[in-house]
From Swiss-Prot:
Protein's organism: Caenorhabditis elegans
Record-annotated TCTP domain positions: 1-181
PANTHER family referenced in this protein's UniProt entry, alphabetically: TRANSLATIONALLY CONTROLLED TUMOR PROTEIN-RELATED, TRANSLATIONALLY-CONTROLLED TUMOR PROTEIN
Name under which the protein is recorded: Translationally-controlled tumor protein homolog
Keywords: Calcium, Cytoplasm
Pfam families in UniProt: TCTP
Presence of the UniProt keyword Glycosyltransferase in the record: no
Function: Involved in calcium binding and microtubule stabilization.
Lineage per the UniProt record: Eukaryota, Metazoa, Ecdysozoa, Nematoda, Chromadorea
Gene Ontology CC: cytoplasm; endoplasmic reticulum
GO molecular function: calcium ion binding
Alphabetized Gene3D superfamilies for the sequence: Metal Binding Protein, Guanine Nucleotide Exchange Factor, Chain A
Family: Belongs to the TCTP family.
Amino acid sequence: MLIYKDIFTDDELSSDSFPMKLVDDLVYEFKGKHVVRKEGEIVLAGSNPSAEEGAEDDGSDEHVERGIDIVLNHKLVEMNCYEDASMFKAYIKKFMKNVIDHMEKNNRDKADVDAFKKKIQGWVVSLLAKDRFKNLAFFIGERAAEGAENGQVAIIEYRDVDGTEVPTLMLVKEAIIEEKC
């Protein structure tokens, strides 16, 4: 399995256990789903928790958690402050600079850096469109929540797929590293 980690904080943000695709060689999109499960239980995509012993509600006082499977599995923390467009703009400006600095420090080709700048600016403008921005949710990893700076904000957009609301997590490719586990 591949884990996708933040290059700045080392937070686990997603994994290849979720359906994913790379869009415009810029953003990984991971499809999640809403789940209800026992607190702390991790269910990998493709498994069948209802077929497992004890999956039915037995009326006990066990805590259950509800949410998006990607968020729960990777212990992401919701950041409501970014729901204000001006706060998000301030964050994304600093984040883009940090990613570009990281690319240059790692001797990335100038053409690659310039292409990234152009693509990321277009993507950010599309996110900030009023009809789209209001449907976004923002999450960070555990270390970023504990005060580690410069971490990537995982953005979830709720998309209509065949009449079903599908939470889609977006991560900037240049700000994550793949790690085999």
